[in-house]
């Protein structure tokens, strides 16, 4: 996810 500042754990 480099489009938004979202982090997936």
UniProtKB/Swiss-Prot annotation:
Gene Ontology CC: one annotated term: extracellular region
The species is Scolopendra angulata (Barbados giant red centipede)
Expression across tissues is: Expressed by the venom gland.
Indicate what this protein is called per its UniProt record.
Scolopendra 5887.74 Da toxin
Q: What molecular function does GO assign, one term?
A: toxin activity
Q: Which family does it belong to?
A: Belongs to the scolopendra toxin 4 family.
Q: Does the keyword Calcium apply?
A: no
User: Sorted alphabetically, which keywords does the UniProt record give?
Assistant: Neurotoxin, Secreted, Toxin
Q: State if Transmembrane is listed as a keyword.
A: no
What is the annotated localization of this protein? Secreted
Task: Kindly report the protein's main subcellular placement as a broad class.
Answer: secreted
Q: Which domain of life is it from?
A: Eukaryota
